[in-house]
Amino acid sequence: MKSCGVSLTTAAVAFGDEAKKMAAGKASREGEEEPLSLTVEEREALGDMDSRLFGFVRLHEDGARTKTLLGKAVRCYESLILKAEGKVESDFFCQLGHFNLLLEDYSKALSAYQRYYSLQADYWKNAAFLYGLGLVYFYYNAFHWAIKAFQDVLYVDPSFCRAKEIHLRLGLMFKVNTDYKSSLKHFQLALIDCNPCTLSSAEIQFHIAHLYETQRKYHSAKEAYEQLLQTENLPAQVKATVLQQLGWMHHNMDLVGDKATKESYAIPYLQKSLEADPNSGQSWYFLGRCYSSIGKVQDAFVSYRQSIDRSEASADTWCSIGVLYQQQNQPIDALQAYICAVQLDHGHAAAWMDLGTLYESCNQPQDAIKCYLNAARSKRCSNTSTLAARIKFLQNGSDNWNGGQSLSHHPVQQVYSLCLTPQKLQHLEQLRANRDNLNPAQKHQLEQLESQFVLMQQMRHKEVAQVRTTGIHNGAIADSSLPTNSVSNRQPHAALTRVSSVSQPGVRPACVEKLLSNGAFSAGCIPCGTSKILGSTDTILLGSNCIAGSESNGNVPYLQQNTHTLPHSHTDLNSSTEEPWRKQLSNSTQGLHKSQSSCLSGPNEEQPLFSTGSAQYHQATSTGIKKSNEHLTLPSNSVPQGDADSHLSSHTATSGGQQGIMFTKESKPSKNRSLVPETSRHTGDPSNGCADVKGLSNHVHQLIADAVSSPNHGDSPNLLIADNPQLSALLIGKANGNVGTGTCDKVNNIHPAVHTKTDHSVASSPSSAISTATPSPKSTEQRSINSVTSLNSPHSGLHTVNGEGLGNSQSSTKVDLPLVSHRSTSQIIPSMSVSICPSSTEVLKACRNPGKNGLSNSCILLDKCPPPRPPTSPYPPLPKDKLNPPTPSIYLENKRDAFFPPLHQFCTNPKNPVTVIRGLAGALKLDLGLFSTKTLVEANNEHIVEVRTQLLQPADENWDPTGTKKIWRCESNRSHTTIAKYAQYQASSFQESLRAGMQWCDLSSLQPPPPGFKRFSHLSLPNSWNYRHLPSCPTNFCIFVETGFHHVGQAHLELLTSGGLLASASQSAGITGVSHHAR
């Protein structure tokens, strides 16, 4: 394949000397310092570095010499591009993209790759470029383009050294897209490949087992997991994850008998998983769920506490704790736990529903309504109709609560609206600890925080007293073994706001600290009800409203009437309106990751419901190759601010919405990036005018959904990562005039992408920095001004160069810059060197020694044959009414009308593909009796007739004979008979229909033909067409031109219809085929 760079005669020239030549004669640059230069040794070392080293190069070894060298090379390239005003060799940008990719600066790598793509016409010959571009798209979850780039690599270079990595990523992406057959194929290809890979064979086998689980082939998944456990020298972390998956599968799936039997299998698996990895917060959470389902509330609480201590705060865990408290008649403690859950994830529908149920049980309908409204607003809530009915009931009957006395309580949002956030509480503690060393400004801030803290305390005590006096029927709050008020004396509840906040590690709301200090439950605990699986097709209802011993409301039929249990409130994920890939997205995020975190796991039944909005797409698979401390752990991404559907989402299949098993070992994308980043996790402080650009990869975790799933984006990979004015301002530090503040690192922001005329611009938020506007980069009339920018520029403005556009950049005189010489690889065969008529001996000789794994080491493609690709979809897309236009119908009254030239022109006009002509037989005075069965038998009874049998199917579908898959070719079984035999069949079948006492009806009762009907069978037979009309009544016929059948390989119809009439017309009448469909 073509190398990433080209060898120039000026390669030996130092970068410093070249820069001096370019700067000669430019007085404005006399005062500037000389740019960095690369030595010969450094250029030789860089010559071996391209995208193929991604995941294998260790940047922090040897004193981080490799990372320093790559950073120096990037700065040199950026400086020279600025001086050359962007008019450099296209391979220069390819090398720059490789270096930025190895440094894991994905935004800059994408910009450089896009520039190379737009400048190099035969970019498809460069396999290293396609591989690097695919890695960047994979990082940004642009699976549509990543799949295309990786497939192009395998097409142009089947023996590519990183083919195993490509198969691995293709398997993950196809699993996300629910193409399980393709996913399994690529996982198996990766498994049998002996080349080095960032993932071990055991980890690939884990992905295959999880793929079965995602397909709900639980027995196959169980066998695959158990077979993996028998592997010798299985890494401890892989073993822990497999055991975790097996335990959670037994808990949720009906693999064995009743509940007690399932838990008897699930709990030992989870305990063994914790033996292999005691720090797995996810396994502790699953164990708590299992204990809770069988009534071991004390053990469940201990497991939940262990989960919180070993991982970041999880909304799922706190919601489950709230259910336990609510089950124990401790509404205040349950309230605090639910508030922790909704604070960590404001869109946690199950927590809002449980909180609404709690308020409803305490006769606070207005607060319950507000909680139900919040649950209904959540994008992960599927039972909105049930919630709407409940809200309507509460609104209509709220005045009748408590004997007609309506209660006026502050809603939960108001109770804690004055509370400090966990971050401010931590800051307050720090200021108090350093009170003696504070400056005047800090002392003033401390006074303000303490005054606000006092107001919060007063508000909290007032609200708690109100709930105690009016909110509980029986007066007594709970078992004396647990305090009724779990709020710390020093710290109030964390505030509940519309903007969800993420609790930082080590910083917990006050209710969290107090709830953890409550200890175990009393011995007389009531077991909690078993929660439904999220994948269940049953309607999932709200919990009991009889928690405190109150009488259940008979007017609420869908509420459970069990006064002893309070099942978890779940949302049903099997919504018919939800796309399958969105349901399965979190399950395909399995990647075994090297870090000190807990295992991920979960059943594919519990999958988070992802937003269907145009600007959200969850990062399903980790794109970086991550390594930490040289051993495997399965991380628990416990910040549930993404798309966790319910309080169970963190344990969804294969880690649920909160985790992803990273499939890579060697590389580390970012210290701050979680394994499965949530869509709003890293949006940053809105008050900051300039974000850390080097951490941009941690911010871009959203995609416009159409950019991933829609096939209507053409074949251009030009993601507009840098052409958004707001995002560009963020990258170059111009936001709020903070360019020269030093808060941003230097970034070479190249803009090769193009804008379209439609409104597909990049989202203004840095978390949605990928656009769908990607026409062909060769359309120079649609290009925006390309610029090369530097964040460390002494000027506050943008360095806009090459303002004339890319079209002029290639035609202009280019500065001869010294490129790093890359070792050449196999090249595309020139078309002139290939003979089109080789002998068999030459062919056999060429096929000998095909190379490794049966694949040739040299490419057999011609230099003018790019990889195949489907044609671009028409733009703009046609509306539905245009896809199925109304069919014109014309009625003929006489022969003159039939031969009217405008009628012929109308019928042959491409704008009218189908035309129905009525009254043709009468206008032409055709004697259809001449074509009756009797007449044909008398004329030529031995004439061979072809009979075809076709399947009944909708007009817009075409299935194969087995009915298992859609095909393009119209299948039709062919057989032959004679007119005499067909007449005999027709007569006998007609007699059978008469004996069956068939009742004739009007033509309006026509029914579609059943499967296996014969094209020439009698229309009046119930076992064929089932067209019910008197056989003696002639019918009207639809006239179809011959081309209407030939485009699917069908001959026009030529034989009998009902009543002995032949559905064919005279060729002299200008009709080539007549349909026997009665009208």
From Swiss-Prot:
Subcellular locations according to the entry: Nucleus
Recorded family membership: Belongs to the UTX family.
One Pfam family named in its UniProt record: TPR_8
Keywords, comma-separated and alphabetical: Chromatin regulator, Dioxygenase, Iron, Metal-binding, Nucleus, Oxidoreductase, Phosphoprotein, Repeat, TPR repeat
Keyword Iron found: yes
Protein's job: Male-specific histone demethylase that catalyzes trimethylated 'Lys-27' (H3K27me3) demethylation in histone H3. Has relatively low lysine demethylase activity.
TPR repeat locations: 90-123, 127-160, 164-198, 202-235, 240-280, 281-314, 316-348, 349-382
Compositionally biased region (Polar residues): 558-601, 609-626, 647-656, 782-795
Ranges of compositional bias, category Low complexity: 761-779
Claim: Phosphoprotein is one of the keywords in the record: yes
Gene name, Swiss-Prot/TrEMBL: UTY
Stated name of the protein: Histone demethylase UTY
Lineage: Eukaryota, Metazoa, Chordata, Craniata, Vertebrata
A GO term from the CC aspect: MLL3/4 complex
First-listed, main subcellular location of the protein, grouped into a coarse class: nucleus
Cofactor: L-ascorbate; Fe(2+)
InterPro entries in UniProt: Corepressor-Demethylase, TPR-like_helical_dom_sf, TPR_rpt
Modified residues (Phosphothreonine): T887
PROSITE patterns: TPR, TPR_REGION
Assembly notes: Interacts with TLE1 and TLE2.
EC numbers on record: 1.14.11.68
Catalytic activity: N(6),N(6),N(6)-trimethyl-L-lysyl(27)-[histone H3] + 2 2-oxoglutarate + 2 O2 = N(6)-methyl-L-lysyl(27)-[histone H3] + 2 formaldehyde + 2 succinate + 2 CO2
Gene3D superfamilies per the UniProt record, alphabetical: 1.20.58.1370, Cupin, Tetratricopeptide repeat domain
PANTHER family: HISTONE DEMETHYLASE UTY, LYSINE-SPECIFIC DEMETHYLASE
Region (Disordered): 558-694, 757-813
